[in-house]
Amino acid sequence: MKIYINQLGYYSDSIKTVVLAQTADASGSIPQAPETVQICSVDGICLLEKEPVYFGYDKASGDYVWHADFSEIHAPGSYIVKSKDVTSYPFAIGTGLYNALHTSLSKMLYFQRCGMELLPEYAGQFARKECHTAPSVLWSEYKKYLAGEIQSEDMQHFDIRGGWHDAGDYGRYSTAAAVALAHILYAYRFFPDTFDKNLNIPESGNGMPDILSECLYELKWLLQMQDEEGGVYHKQCTLRHANFVMPHEDTNQMILYPVSSMAVADFAAIMALASRIYYPYDHDFATQALQAALKSYDWLQAHPEFIGFTNPEETNTGEYDDTSDLDERLWAAMELYRTTGEKHYLTDAKTLFDTLDITTEFGWGDVSGFAGWALLEQELMPETCHSEPDYTNALEADFAKVYRHEFLTEANRILDIIRKSGYFVDLSPHEFCWGSNMVVLNRAMLLSTAYVLDNQKKYEDAAMQQMDYILGVNASDYSYITGAGAHAFRHPHNRVTEADGIDDTIPGYVSGGPNGKPADEKAEWLILPGTPPMKCYLDIWECYSLNEITIYWNSPAIFTTAFLSRQK
């Protein structure tokens, strides 16, 4: 039998449920139920005894599952759960439990910075040298250079530097950047009081909240990715992924890959949002961001056709492909309406919305949910969310009702998935995909949104349960955030942490999580066919389809912990 708890802990007033799980014996019989569960202080004093309640068979894990609720324990302290001779990892009950985690999740972004030296006073033992400062070239010219048709000096060179390394590689991708930024900037917009922390970054103390200073580093890189006509390069990468070397040792040619309409629309959206967010702190940047957004929106109007992106056959870096840009265009139109107040953007947004079947997603593959956040902003911001909405025209008011209904309908659908899970996770068995933890956290953001819109505790409890899953209530028995919990994963697929020669792992990385269809050689070799999807996980750095990290897996965790940290 195994006992699964949130290894970080539980708020004094939150829902608290321990999961007990067993697999069937060789005969296939249902295991014998655990008789009792004891909630004890870490020094072994039993404080509460409960009889577990049988949930049933959990298909995603292949386990027979029991639950024991111990929500009546409120006293701050350190605890363990016992059942017969099995003991859980220690955990805390109290207040402020997510504060340090929220900080480490946010500080991860600093450790992803490209184009600058990370100094010991900010990075500690993870200090490293400046990287990727050489000029970039256009793919259209570089492929001619590779074919011997032109010389190096015949290519245009672009001094584009900065931003965050996207993931375990050293590429930087426009659509992924926009999505990660949107998660974080909206988290700041909706839960600003949770972002009063000093992240100990070079900009700390400059009069701007540290999280906004960190995001500004990425935004300033993204501004450089816009061409003279308003198009936006899809990505800035080398031809192929770097070897597992430190960033400054990756000296291969950086390439600007062609403009995609997804990148242009995402760029227009995030710059319009940034203009609103940064106006109180940096008027000049806010103005620059809005002008850039308008320029890219004009580009979209001049190019109504879908312009996708596919990797050239010579390239193996992240593709971030798509089959439509309608959701991206929707997001761009809505952000520009919210920033400028000009009704034609709202009209554009409603026309695009009416073409879509899915409207509540927050990932790079579908950004439609961000349009809903922009539209419903006054209903989600703390200073206005408790007041009657004051929309300026009938179209906006009616559209807001529709989007509110969309969010709540999707939240209720997710609640139904959670009820069917022995581990209270918002994934059906077939949804344990590459980056499954991103899906968990994106849905936690939607549940958080539903709570603010509708003030029903069931949504807050469900969002909390998703962090329980991420932090240890899962059949792999890991906390999926480095440095968070007694059994946190330690070996991300990340070039820096493998090449730096340091035994400790940078804290605050979110793992991609279990993948029912492993897609890397190591995982395919080690995970046996028929393994239940929730158990298709290995804490091995080579397993990039299970254990990579990326900015847009951290960003929904930043949002969710900001929501859970408010007034706690």
Where are these regions (language model features)?
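Flexible, small-residue-rich helix->loop connector segments that border functional cores
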Residues: 190-192
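Short, glycine/acidic-rich hinge or "gate" loops at secondary-structure transitions
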Residues: 195-202, 233
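Acidic, glycine-anchored loop motifs typical of Ca2+
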Residues: 203, 207
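Carboxylate/His-rich catalytic cores and anion/metal-binding grooves
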Residues: 208-231
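Proline-centered turn/helix-capping motifs that create local helix->coil transitions or kinks
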Residues: 226-236, 304-309, 341-344, 416-420
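Zinc-dependent metallopeptidase catalytic helix centered on the HExxH motif
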Residues: 361-363
